[in-house]
Amino acid sequence: MSGIDPKRFGKVAVLLGGDSAEREVSLNSGRLVLQGLRDAGIDAHPFDPAQRPLAALKDEGFVRAFNALHGGYGENGQIQGALDFYGIRYTGSGVLGSALGLDKFRTKLVWQQTGIPTPPFETVMRGDDYAARAQDIAAKLGVPLFVKPASEGSSVAVEKVKSADALPAALEEAAKHDKIVIVEKSIEGGGEYTACIAADLDLPLIRIVPAGEFYDYHAKYIANDTQYLIPCGLDAAKEAEFKRIARRAFDVLGCTDWGRADFMLDAAGNPYFLEVNTAPGMTDHSLPPKAARAVGIGYSELVVKVLSLTLD
């Protein structure tokens, strides 16, 4: 374990649940985080902001929080700003990094300006002429394409579109979840990878091989036939290079401490970064625990390591 006296952490809230589309994932993550912290002797308690006012954190003597909320106000900077206001230390990125990290549109704009490779894309606004935009986008980017709401996580409402005819319906569905929709060229041929970032830990890349078309919500949290390859199959030099780019992709957004950066490789082995996750899932299907386990770090040790960053 970390060797840190559990009493140093004081009273810790595990923020879980919330009211986003990822509530169930957050509840599952939070329960495991709570148990992991308690296993280490830390005075940790569950706290669902959808059911209790945040002011109760201060009133009840909490001094720090492990943020296991996913999506919505738990990941877009709002909860971070509130915790800053109440003087409660918390895991993960601050207001700016959280807000940018959840916004795929602005993430890609920052990456384009800072030299981080990301797939070509177009944006569609809710209420646009979806049929007309679909024709224009298919002509520019070709197919297949990924359609995704700009600010949802866990692949909520993400659809892979293989024909221009299917694009208008996918745009309409994604626009129900966000006023900005990203339409991204599908990068094919080299596979999907994730880089897990946790302070100074050197965690291995994971190659993700879903049984279906792509790594969607079902593949992430329900299916048992998704393959997670560790080691990922890349040579050591390539893996080190992609981890370095992933860390920079994280840093240029103002993200800190821990999270995940997801990317695809094309047939030539070139990386294209898709998104970061500043409050990654911590369920039994989630990637950070898998990466940590591969280098001998157990679940409880990992969550204590993440929480220990709030002591700095």
Curated annotation (Swiss-Prot):
Binds 2 magnesium or manganese ions per subunit. It is found in: Cytoplasm. GO terms for biological process: cell wall organization; peptidoglycan biosynthetic process; regulation of cell shape. Coiled coil: none annotated. It holds the Pfam family Dala_Dala_lig_N. Its cofactor is Mg(2+); Mn(2+). Mg(2+) 1 binds at D262, E275. The keyword Cytoplasm applies. It comes from the Bacteria. Its EC number is 6.3.2.4. Mg(2+) 2 binds at E275, N277. Residues 108-308 form the ATP-grasp domain. It is an enzyme of class 6 (ligase). GO terms for molecular function: ATP binding; D-alanine-D-alanine ligase activity; metal ion binding. Keywords: ATP-binding, Cell shape, Cell wall biogenesis/degradation, Cytoplasm, Ligase, Magnesium, Manganese, Metal-binding, Nucleotide-binding, Peptidoglycan synthesis. GO terms for cellular component: cytosol. PANTHER family: D-ALANINE--D-ALANINE LIGASE, D-ALANINE--D-ALANINE LIGASE B. Belongs to the D-alanine--D-alanine ligase family. Cell wall formation. This is D-alanine--D-alanine ligase.
